Amino acid sequence: MTTDTIVAQATAPGRGGVGIIRVSGPLAAHVAQTVTGRTLRPRYAEYLPFTDEDGQQLDQGIALFFPNPHSFTGEDVLELQGHGGPVVMDMLIRRILQIKGVRPARPGEFSERAFLNDKMDLTQAEAIADLIDASSEQAAKSALQSLQGEFSKRIHTLVESLIHLRIYVEAAIDFPEEEIDFLADGKVSADLQTIIDNLAAVRREANQGAIMREGMKVVIAGRPNAGKSSLLNALSGKESAIVTDIAGTTRDVLREHIHIDGMPLHIIDTAGLRDASDAVEKIGIERAWEEIRQADRVLFMVDGTTTEATDPQDIWPDFVDKLPENIGITVIRNKADQTGEPLGICHVNQPTLIRLSAKTGQGVDALRQHLKECMGFSGNQEGGFMARRRHLDALERAAEHLAIGQQQLEGYMAGEILAEELRIAQQHLNEITGEFSSDDLLGRIFSSFCIGK
């Protein structure tokens, strides 16, 4: 429990019908008595005047007192709900700061105190900021799932499985004289594989949650003059790229940040891929491949007037072979206005095929819908959980150590090394929920929150 008392405006700054001042700490009840002249009953909304040090009324509104530990922060909490004008809010905060022992809250300090007082774990605290920042209904649903503990529950299940397996492995190490070789009886190997599979499932869902929060990186790639720049312009709704009939017009990477129904996308147009002799064009092609390797999804642009093929392996096998295995690919057969092909999306074969005309805009709506679905949008789902880059990094490191442990078990029956790898993997998972986190990490996370949250 902290010993100082903090105050901040909990509602957004600016004019509004209602503005809320939040106070948390051991002096919250004293602040209530000083500002309202009353001893507040816990959990009762009371309509009272808010006065200055001379007893002059500054405002009037509702006062609510929540004694610890049954409050958002786990401390004594006072909320003053007054009129939402910035001058009124500023006068009230200045009045409260006149009380000895009260200071302004740092950004995110209320949520930080809630975390430190075990009112929520770190993923739930982060979900508050994600819910506030949500740019789409789906993102809000995902953030709410995390706030309600869905992500934490998945992590805790993995940690419990790791703990049980560690106990079993360490028992086998500590009692080698037992007639049964516990490491070789198949249970350890089977349980470890189950944990690895479950972790992989959580990683897939976390990747989707991170895309929902941070945006999906989509790279438009293909041969020169396939219509890549025209597609960038069609998706962004403006003439971001120069479009000509001259092959190789785009020589550098062009970026546009767009939203499709509130869902963020980073669209990147790249230089046409070919064997170039021009030094500048070569640099552009190298940069194109750098972007492709970092993409969440590649839109493989094909000039429909040059081939009837729809399978990337048939169209350009060398391109497909150079793609990283984990990157999704969508084939875009462009210039449907010239070929007369039926517009729209085809899911019959893998990868997904979309026929459109970037020049006229026909079929582009089908691509927009497809990109939304790739980001996890579904009108009839409640949404998965929200994830951040640090979550993905921790999950990846945990998976790496489990893989090392599995290799040591299967190759050498090295129980001691397996036990250590399990311990490290568990530590990385605990970083996600904050059960093992450095002060520096906590400071960076909560400093990104709004003041008053």
Swiss-Prot record:
Q: How is the cofactor bound?
A: Binds 1 potassium ion per subunit.
* Binding-site list for (6S)-5-formyl-5,6,7,8-tetrahydrofolate: 22, 79, 119, 453
User: What EC number(s) would the UniProt record show?
Assistant: 3.6.-.-
Checking Gene3D superfamilies in the record gives: P-loop containing nucleotide triphosphate hydrolases, Probable tRNA modification gtpase trme, domain 1, tRNA modification GTPase MnmE domain 2
Gene Ontology CC annotations of this record: cytoplasm; cytosol
What's the superkingdom here?
Bacteria
Q: Which residues bind GTP?
A: 225-230, 244-250, 269-272, 334-337
Q: What does this gene product do?
A: Exhibits a very high intrinsic GTPase hydrolysis rate. Involved in the addition of a carboxymethylaminomethyl (cmnm) group at the wobble position (U34) of certain tRNAs, forming tRNA-cmnm(5)s(2)U34.
Q: What's this protein's family per the entry? A: Belongs to the TRAFAC class TrmE-Era-EngA-EngB-Septin-like GTPase superfamily. TrmE GTPase family.
Under the heading HAMAP family, the entry gives: GTPase_MnmE (MF_00379)
Question: NCBIfam families annotated for this entry?
Answer: mnmE_trmE_thdF, PRK05291.1-3, small_GTP
**Quaternary assembly:** Homodimer. Heterotetramer of two MnmE and two MnmG subunits.
Q: What is this protein called?
A: tRNA modification GTPase MnmE
What is the species of this protein?
Vibrio cholerae serotype O1 (strain ATCC 39315 / El Tor Inaba N16961)
